[in-house]
């Protein structure tokens, strides 16, 4: 695993998708999907050291655990009524839109989550953008195994 290559992929996907933040969360024995790697565009606050959230109860993670390989949210403000989600959204800088893509092991268990966050405005993600996020997640999976 090369930290430099992982960071380079996060930078590339953030710039390709014109987002302000890209994070890679990896499975851990000590917490539920902590942020292992993060890229923030200039002027964007890091969320790596935000207070720990119970990610196991977050709606996106629950969708992933139910089998979704990717969750695309065009407008995070209306994505769910879950108060914990909106608390997280504000802690994460007022996230306006996001795409989260899962990587799984051979048994189908989630081992990684690539998140890309648009902090500027809601947006309609295109199929090409979702595919770019999937390609980045696949590359990150290769780099972290």
Regions found by a protein language model. Name each.
Residues 1-38, 46-47, 57-58:
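Helix-loop-beta substructure at the N-terminus of cytosolic sensory domains
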Residues 10, 85-86:
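Generic structural marker for isolated residues within well-ordered, non-membrane alpha-helices
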Residues 27, 44-83, 90, 96:
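Regulatory sensory and allosteric helical modules in signal-transduction proteins
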Residues 37-39, 75, 115:
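Short clusters of small/polar residues that mark proteolytic maturation junctions
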Residues 96-105:
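A short, aliphatic-rich beta-strand micro-motif
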Residues 107-118:
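Sensory beta-strand/linker motifs that couple input domains to effectors
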Residues 118-136, 143-145:
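Regulatory loop-to-helix N-cap segments in sensory/regulatory domains
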């Amino acid at each position: 695993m090369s930290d430099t290559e992982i960071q380079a992929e996060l930078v590339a996907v953030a710039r390709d998708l014109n987002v302000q933040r890209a994070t890679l969360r990896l499975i851990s024995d000590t917490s539920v999907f902590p942020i292992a790697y993060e890229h923030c565009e200039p002027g964007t606050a890091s969320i790596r050291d935000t207070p720990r959230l119970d990610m196991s109860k977050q709606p996106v993670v629950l969708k992933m655990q139910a089998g979704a390989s990717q969750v695309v949210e065009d407008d995070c403000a209306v994505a769910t009524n879950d108060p914990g989600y909106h608390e997280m959204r504000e802690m994460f800088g007022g996230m306006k839109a996001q795409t989260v893509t899962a990587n799984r092991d051979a048994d189908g268990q989630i081992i990684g989550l690539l998140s890309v966050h648009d902090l500027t405005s809601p947006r309609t993600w295109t199929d090409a953008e979702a595919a770019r996020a999937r390609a980045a997640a696949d590359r990150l999976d290769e780099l972290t195994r």
